[in-house]
């Protein structure tokens, strides 16, 4: 819900420090990490609340190939509070890497036999990529809550909680599917039902 506002503020801030910003749009976190390497950026920021309730949001940061954590986060906060920031005139360009991302996965993976899958994206951002990718891999896909909606109207997008995969379990049984896949809100966690 606050994602677009945070994303725009972040992009403006990075540009004001002289950075070249590449906007790949709304994407699952693994695709954002892929983009950093694929586009030779080395760094990336995902605006995400992950598997938290919709009123929460945050940033996952990779700087120069390293995930920002612990001391680096404290240091970044100090620099922001002290206004110890670079200034410059950056740039912004939009790039759609969805097909490149899918092609990379398709090239790297082989499925021994076509699978019948039920895919529950929990209305998270994986819904924009996962069903199509799995079909391109040769799977038969039945979608469950794959329309992206940050209010998560059907269930909380945390596949580690049994109450969030009840419908998925039922559909796997009813359809005699090989597997059920449940993604979290930003697509970097996966629950598997067999």
Give names to the regions the model predicted.
Residues 1-56, 103, 133-192:
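N-terminal small/polar loop signature for handling phosphorylated ligands or for N-terminal nucleophile
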Residues 57-175:
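Gly/Ser/Thr-enriched, mixed-charge loops and adjacent short helices
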Residues 61, 192-194:
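Conserved hydrophobic "DFG−1" position in protein kinase catalytic cores
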């Amino acid at each position: 819900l606050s994602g677009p506002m945070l994303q725009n503020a972040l992009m403006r801030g990075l540009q004001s420090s002289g950075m070249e910003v590449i906007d790949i749009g709304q994407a699952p976190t693994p695709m954002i990490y892929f983009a950093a390497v694929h586009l030779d950026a080395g760094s990336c920021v995902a605006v995400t609340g992950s598997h938290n309730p919709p009123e929460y949001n945050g940033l996952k940061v990779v700087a120069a190939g390293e995930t920002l954590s612990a001391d680096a986060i404290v240091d970044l906060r100090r620099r922001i509070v002290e206004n110890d920031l670079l200034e410059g005139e950056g740039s912004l360009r939009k790039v759609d890497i969805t097909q490149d991302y899918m092609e990379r996965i398709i090239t790297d993976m082989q499925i021994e036999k076509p699978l019948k899958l039920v895919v529950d994206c929990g209305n998270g951002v994986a819904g924009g990529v996962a069903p199509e990718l799995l079909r391109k891999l040769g799977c038969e896909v039945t979608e469950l809550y794959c329309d992206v909606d940050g209010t998560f109207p059907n269930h909380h997008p945390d596949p580690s909680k049994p109450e969030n995969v009840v419908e998925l379990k039922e559909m796997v049984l009813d359809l005699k599917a090989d597997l059920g896949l449940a993604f979290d809100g930003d697509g970097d966690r996966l629950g598997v039902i067999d």
